[in-house]
Amino acid sequence: MSAFAGGIQTIDIHAHFYPESYLRILSELDGESPVTCSWDHADGPIITFWGGDTPPLHKTYYDFHERVKEMDDKGVDIHCLSLTQPMVHWADPALALKLSETYNDACAEAHKAYPDRYLGFAMLPMLQPDAALEELKRRADLPGMRGVYPSTQIEGRELSDTLFFPHLRGRARDGLAHVPASGPRRRI
């Protein structure tokens, strides 16, 4: 834990996390998928999506035990874990739900292992309203989950699109949603 005077905690509310279980699912996808993951690089897995590659992911992106050591080194008390690009919205409905559940379960696992260090922002398959609402309800029972992390633009649709109204109503009843800016900055 950090040594800041006065007991003030340092909280990183925008801490991206690619659980190994999520990456393993991506690595099992065939070459026709717009998103894949390769574990062939010595420095870490590489995610390929929409024609580009991430740099090799450092172990702290996918191993929450290693991440705690880095948090200690940097004086950070709590990470609010969130998935970043490519998220799940590119996938067919069944895969989007599987990836969301896998990610959310991994966040809960990190919280159970380090309850004072990790909280999670859930991922939902936003383009499938019924599945997203069910996962939103399931997420409420997972330990350490404190909100939802959507993009402001999902497959060309802004959060103001009526497709997302059921999710937004569910979140309003449920509490916090952390909404990162993405896509054109016309309005947020």
Regions found by a protein language model. Name each.
Residues 1-188:
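Helix-coil boundary/capping segments in enzymes
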